[in-house]
Design a protein with these regions (language model features):
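Glycine-rich phosphate/diphosphate-binding loop of Rossmann-like nucleotide-binding domains
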Residues: 1-36
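Active-site rim loops that border cofactor/substrate pockets in soluble metabolic enzymes
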Residues: 24-55
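Glycine-rich phosphate-binding loop
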Residues: 47-84
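Short, acidic/small-residue loops that bind anionic groups at enzyme active sites
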Residues: 74-102, 120-121
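A charged, well-structured terminal subsegment
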Residues: 116-141
Length: 141
């Protein structure tokens, strides 16, 4: 049985809980063994993956960054996304990126699937991507 670690940056907990719910539901339907670790913010996701890289077959990174008035948004997004990509390539492990980057709270809620008018859920999409890679494209999802 494949083992996946979900790392949830819970700074915007009301948004990310919907991502966690969608990704765990999808993984359980696929009979994937899951563990979840909560971290304070998106910037802490890469180190959490690195510390656990030998224990799991794949990872799902979940979080939310909402643009403010300073360059902080760009710095956090760029450094975190680059670190996650480098970990995936270096250790040959799939990492589904379900980190929402939004210009405002409404966009973040839409991308988390929390608004009934929108069926997009980045947690679901990240889980689907990781499982697709783990199954090596042999099964249709």
């Amino acid at each position: 049985m494949k083992k996946i670690l979900i790392i949830n940056a819970n700074y915007y907990n009301d948004i990310t809980q919907n991502l966690v719910k969608a990704s765990t539901t999808f993984c359980k339907k696929r009979k994937i063994s899951l563990s979840i670790i909560n971290v304070p913010g998106v910037f802490e996701i890469p180190i959490c993956i690195r510390k656990n890289v030998k224990k799991f077959d794949g990872f799902i990174a979940l979080g939310c960054v909402i643009k403010g008035q300073t360059p902080h948004f760009d710095l956090i997004c760029n450094s975190s996304f680059n670190a996650i990509m480098n970990l995936s390539i270096t250790f040959n492990k799939p990492i589904g990126n379900g980190i929402i980057t939004a210009l405002n709270r409404k966009q973040a809620l839409e991308r988390s699937g929390k608004l009934k008018s929108n069926k997009i859920n980045k947690g679901f999409e990240a889980a689907k991507a990781v499982i697709s890679i783990l199954e090596n494209g042999t099964k249709k999802i």
